[in-house]
Swiss-Prot record:
One of its GO terms (molecular function) is ATP binding. It is an enzyme of class 2 (transferase). It comes from Neisseria meningitidis serogroup B (strain ATCC BAA-335 / MC58). This is Phosphoenolpyruvate synthase. GO terms for biological process: gluconeogenesis.
Length: 794
């Protein structure tokens, strides 16, 4: 067969992009180069750019197209739609030239013969010669047709693929990116179908799509064919896998988030383009579990690493699990085109919203920006034209056809979709904040309503009422002076960890476990340990919350492990000091099922908390769960940069008892390099510092409690709040005692209280006293670093 017009995938390399487009060249590259390394890619063939150009030259088609486009204004959406439709119909009506027709038939017959004469089904996909250039994400600009069989249906699908180079979004996109229409050609790829209609499929990236953090693989997954994930028609499951521990052969799944997965795309019994697939509802039982196993997540992540290493750059990869043979296949791989382009930009832009906020709805945050404007509710594509510059576009889900109007919006909000859908990809590329998968945003938001859309607060994006006060700060990270002390960060929210990873720091000086328990678990540990004793209503609520996990107790341990592992991975191999849960009894009582198990205390700030709680008969089994989670993170997952901090240790007896309890739960001081840090936050800790240090490897000073207990004031009381000041001479005496005791014994001493974040002069005094590290809120890291360098590097 002449390979003028048709080439088999295995004969293609990345050097053939101009002949068969990025998508098909990449399939050929993987089949020929990565099959031996264990990456499975279904085979097939591609038509060439020459074939496409020969087709357009046939019957004077290209002249008619050029004439129609020459006078088109793409900002006129109605005219764009009319001209695009006319051109596409011309293409569908034009038969293939004789040679192309013959080569397609010969290739198809060979494909059928190679399959043993079976009635095979294929995917017919477009691959534009400019589609996957790193500076132009043509994501989903052209069509894909799934479950096509029979030669006539394959040829019809190829006609549709060729026509898709002139759909509205593709025409608009080329103008937007400065491509001439006739320099982009199209290749049709014909690939054996993976039966993910009865399995699962999704997308993965070899970096975090929102922060650009490149030490993770981000995997999305849902039931059925992958188009729903790509189009944003479902909210998929999401997983993060940590590359360094994956390479080391350790369990490396950092985090799992269950998506709603309401529908799945399956095959129909029709085999022609446009009729070969349909969506059906997913049974509730399947929705309430993860669509792929931990073993499959890990296997996919290994494929992602292999592909990324081969291409030498971050990648965006589509995959499918065949429901018949149970195997995982890679369907596409292309360069990631947004975050990896920002590598040279070492400026950090942070958004903060000031004042009171009323949440109208929430979903998955795309990007890390904030947008504001009036709501523009759009039911379908026919209303697109009503979107004006600065509107907040609110709709059920966007179609890639909407790209021409998406760039007018100040923000985008959708009911459906996950972080790898088209709306998300285009929003990222345009630099517009988007909140996807809100569920019912189109019902909760009203046309013309003024809103603020925030993607600056972690994985969850919020739509707030009104045009709120937004503060923007820009920081250049390139020219940071040497810090005169170790600067660390206080981080509680694992969802923000990757965003903070590019801040200059020595690690996390305070990782608050209670944030994980409160936000990501929300249930009292005793209610989970005694699940069988709960009433039916509480059982139902707990069962709903723990969907996807093996048991109530497993849920608690797994969620703590996920949160801590994410925090530790974000700064690995730098230290992460994890404080064991420091809830007070009233805070524990607020958790689901908690009011039954907690005492009522007049002053919980000074009550049943810290070390005394951990060793108490009515809580030590709960503490054991926290220990089990941290042991897993350190010993199984290999994140040995995790250190343990014990808060609120009142007496030397408590210190001895809690160290013993940790050892009994597998967390022995010194074993596998484990350091135990004590929070030095009571006057007794400072006065008896040398004795307390017998049990610990150092102190982290909690200046908040140390101040209130030294000065005898309730920090939660507004009546005496004016007297609260960490810089009070009495407090400084206590801190001096603690720091000097650590220095004398050559043990670690840091501070993780609020004081240094609020008062740079206090941070300076601490450094002069000999403190080893100051742990700051992330938003004050740069400012305090620069202040200390300026004051102390003289």
């Amino acid at each position: 067969m002449a390979d003028n017009y048709v080439i088999w995938f295995e004969n293609l390399r990345m050097t053939d992009v101009e002949r068969v487009g990025g998508k098909n060249a990449s399939l050929g590259e993987m089949i020929s180069q990565l099959t031996e390394k264990g990456v499975r890619v279904p085979g097939g063939f591609a038509t060439t750019a020459e074939a496409y150009r020969a087709f357009l030259a046939h019957n004077g088609l290209s002249e008619r197209i050029s004439a129609a486009l020459a006078k088109l204004d793409v900002e006129d959406v109605a005219e764009l739609a009319r001209v695009g439709k006319e051109i596409r119909q011309w293409i569908l009506d034009t038969p293939f030239p004789e040679q192309l027709d013959a080569e397609i038939e010969a290739a198809w017959n060979k494909m059928v013969a190679d399959a043993g004469g079976a009635d095979i089904s294929v995917a017919v996909r477009s691959s534009a010669t400019a589609e996957d250039l790193p500076d132009a994400s043509f994501a989903g600009q052209q069509e894909t047709f799934l479950n096509i069989n029979g030669l006539d249906n394959v040829k019809e699908a190829m006609h549709h693929v060729f026509a898709s180079l002139y759909n509205d979004r593709a025409i608009s996109y080329r103008v937007h990116k400065g491509f001439e229409h006739d320099i982009v050609a199209l290749s049709a790829g014909v690939q054996r179908m993976v039966r993910s209609d009865s399995g699962a499929s999704g997308v993965m990236f070899t970096l975090d799509t929102e922060s650009g953090y490149d030490q993770v693989v981000f995997v999305t997954s849902s039931y059925g064919l992958g188009e729903n994930v790509v189009q944003g028609a479902v909210n998929p499951d999401e997983f993060y896998v940590f590359k360094p521990t994956l390479k080391a052969g350790k369990p490396a799944i950092l985090r799992k988030t269950m998506g709603s997965k309401h529908i799945k795309m399956i095959f129909t019994d029709k085999a022609e383009a446009g009729k070969s697939v349909t969506n059906v509802d997913v049974p509730e039982e399947d929705r309430n579990r993860f669509s792929i196993t931990d073993e499959e997540i890990t296997e996919l992540a290994h494929y992602a690493l292999t592909i990324e290493k081969h291409y030498g750059r971050p990648m965006d990869i589509e995959w499918g699990r065949d429901g018949l043979d149970g195997k995982l296949y890679i369907l596409q791989a292309r360069p990631e085109t947004v975050k990896s382009q920002e590598e040279g930009n070492r400026n950090l832009r942070r958004f903060a919203i000031n004042g009171d906020k009323t949440v109208l709805c929430e979903g998955r945050a795309i990007g890390q920006k904030v947008g504001q404007g009036k709501v523009r509710l759009i039911k379908d594509a026919s209303e697109m034209d009503s979107v004006e510059a600065g509107d907040v576009l609110v709709t059920d889900m966007t179609d890639p056809d909407w790209e021409p109007v998406m760039k007018r919006a100040s923000a985008i909000v959708t009911n459906r979709g996950g972080r790898t859908c088209h709306a998300a990809i285009i929003a990222r590329e345009l630099g517009i904040p988007a909140v996807v998968g809100c569920g019912n945003a189109t019902e909760l938001l009203k046309n013309g309503q003024e809103v603020t859309v925030s993607c600056a607060e972690g994985d969850t994006g919020f739509i707030y009422a009104g045009l709120l006060d937004v503060q923007i700060t820009d920081v250049a990270l390139d020219n940071m002076p040497k810090a005169p002390v170790k600067v660390m960060m206080n981080v509680g929210n694992p969802e923000l960890a990757f965003s903070f990873a590019n801040l200059p720091s020595e690690g996390i000086g305070l990782a608050r476990m209670e944030f994980i328990i409160n936000r990501q678990i929300g249930i009292h540990p005793k209610a989970l340990l005694e699940f069988d004793k709960q009433d039916d209503e509480l059982k139902a609520e707990i069962t709903r919350r723990i969907a996807g996990y093996a048991s109530p107790v497993d849920f608690y341990v797994d969620k703590i492990a996920e949160g801590v592992a994410t925090l530790a991975a974000s700064v690995y191999p730098r230290k992460t000091i994890v404080r064991m849960s420091d809830f007070k009894s009233n805070e524990y009582a607020n958790l689901v099922g908690g009011n039954v198990y907690e005492p009522h205390e007049e002053n919980p700030m000074l009550g049943f908390r810290g070390a005394a709680r951990y060793v108490a008969d009515n809580f030590k089994d709960c503490f054991a769960l926290e220990c089990k989670a941290l042991k897993r993170v350190r010993d199984e997952m290999g994140l040995t940069n995790v250190e343990i901090m014990i808060p609120f240790v009142r007496t030397l007896g408590e210190a001895e008892a809690v160290v013993k309890a940790l050892k009994e739960n597998g967390l022995e001081r010194g074993k596998n390099g484990l350091r135990l840090i004590m929070m030095c936050e009571l006057p007794s800790n400072a006065v008896l510092a040398e004795q307390f240090l017998q049990y610990f490897d150092g102190f982290s000073i909690g200046s908040n409690d140390m101040t209130q207990l030294t000065l005898g004031l309730d920090r939660d009381s507004g009546l005496v709040s004016e007297s609260f000041d960490e810089r009070n001479p009495a407090v400084k005496v206590m801190l001096h005692l603690a720091i000097s005791a650590c220095r004398k014994q050559n043990k670690y001493v840091g501070i993780c209280g609020q004081g240094p974040s609020d008062h740079p002069d206090f941070a300076k005094w601490l450094v002069e006293e000999g403190i080893e590290s100051v742990s700051l809120n992330p938003d004050t890291v740069i400012e305090t670093w620069l202040y200390l360098a300026n004051e102390l590097n003289k």
